[in-house]
A protein has these predicted regions:
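Helix-loop-helix hairpins and the membrane-proximal interhelical loops
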Residues: 1-50, 163-165, 197-280, 421-425
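Helix-coil boundary and interhelical linker segments in multi-pass alpha-helical membrane proteins
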Residues: 38-50, 89-100, 239-242, 340-342, ...
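Transmembrane alpha-helix interface/packing and boundary motifs in multi-pass membrane proteins
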Residues: 62-75, 184-190, 248-255, 286-296, ...
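Helix-loop-helix junctions within the multi-pass membrane cores of secondary transporters/permeases
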Residues: 2-36, 58, 78-88, 92-140, ...
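Loop-to-helix transition at the N-terminal end of transmembrane alpha-helices
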Residues: 44-64
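Residue-level signature of catalytic and energy-coupling elements of molecular machines
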Residues: 19, 39, 124, 193, ...
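Membrane-embedded alpha-helical modules
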Residues: 94-208, 212, 322-430
Length: 430
């Protein structure tokens, strides 16, 4: 029965190992339960409690889909980077409502389902040069780290120089710096659940500093009625919607591909041809989770690279994912603990996760300037203009223009020409 439901193979693992692996993965990725409400509550009409519940529910739905459909040992939850794009670019930067952004996420999920069913996913993936794929991940990492420093008050607005160092002796900045040191030590020592432990320890330190409020430990789950199925179709045909949907789709797709390839390679569960088994089913689980997540009020749900920690513990089947989902279900009743966490305590995690996401930068061929210049533009523009999508658009435009002018036509796919023209028109007319 377990084999049929989860792809469980008793010759490769045990039920106990699978559940321990699930608990390990949950501990390493559960920081999203603190970070997501902290981010989304900055938008009017999105209460922290409701966002906490929707985040946990999205993780439960996605991870259960991965367990029963994908039969893989991966955890899913609203993605870091994707949530930053939702809040800071679409809503705060472009000025759209969170309802507009949720609609974009919903459309992206539907498109992802169609692409998975029709196998067009590979064509889109192959259309983007690898240097830009790596640059996008690195740029998002830099952007997330910048947001963390800003939320902590370490980096502040300056009318003369745009930004400057904040008052680092203030309570918030000081707590964030202490938390960064603690979390950094835990990461260096490879402590399982180091990010979550770092958040909780920093939160505890914030109590005598007057920065952490105590709400209790256990409560019934918060209602999501304020954010449930709040889709907005007014601007669904606008070019901005196209750009936002494309960005969500692009990041989600490569997040999932990168995680599946990396973790499956580490787990040695590739087939004889070096391909991921049941990859189509894993993508379908991701797409379903994103679509459902938009309906319950959260950003794009994606596969977490932290799943590698559970794989290292011995997780090999969907039973590990089932255990992760059970942990998220239990966490619904511990919202007071997560909602008491101040922004200064989540800021260190944003910085550390930013570091993790910067790792693809080493794969960019910096000696090949036709590749590295557009890649650098992609990376640097995201934090500089406070927009993930603008970083992607400017990187793609510069890649096409530079290589066309240098007669490197073979490097440019037809899809890249089309995208570059559309993006240029966006900047001209919108």
């Amino acid at each position: 029965m377990l084999k049929k439901l989860f792809g469980f193979d008793p010759t490769k693992t045990t039920v106990r190992t699978e559940f321990l692996a699930g608990l390990t993965t949950f501990l390493t990725m559960s920081y999203i339960l603190a970070v997501n409400p902290s981010m989304f509550s900055q938008l009017d009409g999105m209460p922290e409690g409701a966002v906490f519940t929707s985040t946990a529910l999205a993780a439960i739905v996605g991870t259960l889909a991965m367990a029963f459909i994908g039969k893989m040992p991966f955890g899913m939850a609203p993605g870091m980077g994707l949530n930053a794009f939702f809040v800071y670019t679409v809503c705060m930067g472009m000025g759209y409502s969170w309802q507009f952004a949720l609609t974009a996420v919903f459309i992206e999920g539907i498109i992802f389902i169609i692409l998975t069913l029709t196998n067009l996913r590979e064509a889109i993936v192959n259309a983007i040069p690898s240097s830009l794929k790596n640059a996008i991940g690195a740029g998002i990492g830099l952007f997330i780290a910048f947001i963390g420093l800003q939320n902590a008050g370490i980096v502040v607005r300056n009318n003369s120089t745009l930004v400057s160092l904040g008052e680092i002796t203030s309570g918030s900045a000081l707590l964030a710096l202490i938390g960064l040191l603690i979390t950094g030590i835990l990461v260096v020592k490879n402590v399982r659940g180091g990010l979550l432990i770092g958040i909780l320890v920093t939160t505890a330190i914030g109590i005598p500093m007057g920065l952490t409020e105590y709400y209790g430990i256990i409560s019934s789950p918060h209602s999501i009625s304020d954010i449930f199925y709040k889709l907005e179709w007014n601007n669904v045909l606008s070019l901005d919607m196209v750009v936002v949907v494309f960005t969500f789709l692009f990041i989600d797709m490569f997040d999932t591909i990168g995680t599946l390839v990396g973790v499956c390679t580490k787990a040695k569960i590739m087939d004889a041809n070096g391909r991921i088994p049941r990859v189509k089913e894993a993508f379908m689980a991701d797409a379903i989770a994103t679509t459902v997540g938009a309906c319950i009020g959260t950003s794009t749900t994606t596969t977490y690279v932290e799943s590698a920690s559970g794989v290292a513990q011995g997780g090999r089947s969907g039973l590990t994912a089932f255990a992760i989902a059970v942990c998220f279900a239990i966490s619904l009743f511990f919202s007071p603990v997560f909602l008491a966490i101040p922004a200064a305590a989540t800021a260190p995690v944003l910085v550390i996760v930013g570091l993790f996401m910067m790792s693809p930068i080493k794969n960019i061929p910096f000696d090949d300037y036709a590749e590295s210049i557009p890649a650098f533009i992609t990376i640097i523009m995201m934090p500089m203009v406070y927009s993930i999508s603008d970083g992607i658009l400017l990187g793609m435009i510069s890649y096409v223009l530079l290589n066309v002018l240098c007669m490197n036509f073979k490097r440019i796919t037809p899809a890249m020409y089309i995208l570059a023209i559309l993006f240029i028109l966006k900047y001209i007319f919108i």
